[in-house]
Amino acid sequence: MGQLQERFKHYREPQKFMEADVYPYFREIEGKQGTEVEMGGHKVLMFGSNAYTGLTGDQRIIDAAKAALDKYGSGCAGSRFLNGTLDLHVKLEKEISKFIGKDDCLCLSTGFSVNQGVIPALLSKDDYVICDDRDHASIVDGRRLAFARQLHYKHNDMADLERVLQKLPQEAIKLIVVDGVFSMEGDLANLPAIVELKHKYNCSIMVDEAHGIGVFGKQGRGVCDHFGLTDEVDLIMGTFSKSLASIGGFIAADWDTINYLRHTCRTYIFSASNTPAATAAALEALHIIQQEPERIQALWDVTNYALKRFREEGFEIGETESPIIPLYVRDVDKTFLVTALAFKAGVFINPVIPPACAPQDTLVRYALMATHTKEQVDRSVVALKKIFVEQGIIK
């Protein structure tokens, strides 16, 4: 056995949870994702999905993907930089730019690769990147790859952000990178305050709208639109794997910035372009959310109902303002146990443990789709309350 393999010989943390029959990962779904799914012959209510608009099984999107597969084939066999650009990619970029309200955008193969590639491309060794403590892992990896000096501030603490900015040279390039909606806790970035600090300290802002698009703003344009601050935010990132029922991501900005990124962003230049089917699916989903505002209203109706029910039943749900509802457990082992018991009771939810949160902040993440019904919410709340009470988490 080599030295590398020797390092991992004693890594058995997952096996501890497997032996206790509470291991929650890599469960196989046997069919389309919807509000109910089949897993191992077991039907469960799906409250673990990021498909906020409920479009992943929509026949119009499936048909669009099939048509693209027939016309273009299964893949592009190259990067966008060389032989991998389809007219379909360009059409999606034009429509995303218009939808978001920016001059231009780039579409990449995953949302993760957007943050991983854009942040290093933008910044050099004399620049500064400033991030919220709870920014997504893709932002964390992006700033680690950048040569810029890396700073962070306490979660949504504007006084702490100002403390950080006060110490930086006024003339230096300073990029604040923040999630619009925080993916585990469901709260929103304080964009109005961040924009004020941008002007006070001569900064730029990049907002990750992965969990904001299809949820907030006019026709689901995101948190920047929700606050009326699209023009104040320099770069807006988004993903196609959540509300847009596909896979991929984008970065939208002014023409000059996108022109620069198109020729320097390594995850764009050196990755194969997104598949025709995935591109067509995202494009069709974008059309649907603009044509069907009632879909977003349905999402908010069921979200507000679920928030009310969880509060009434005594769950600790933090400061969420979105369809992401954190149900705090505050114990790692109990978080795994609650997840396993919920699955056995017919409710699929996701455990959130370190490093995604601090050990004292563990939770199960409950997320809603526009297609969920109040009856499904009620069934899940009843099942989860029984488990939380039995485990001594709530009374």
Enumerate the predicted regions with their spans.
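N-terminal "arm"/small-domain region of PLP-dependent enzymes with the aminotransferase-like
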Residues: 5-74, 203
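Conserved N-terminal alpha-helix of the aminotransferase class I/II PLP-enzyme fold
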Residues: 63, 67-111
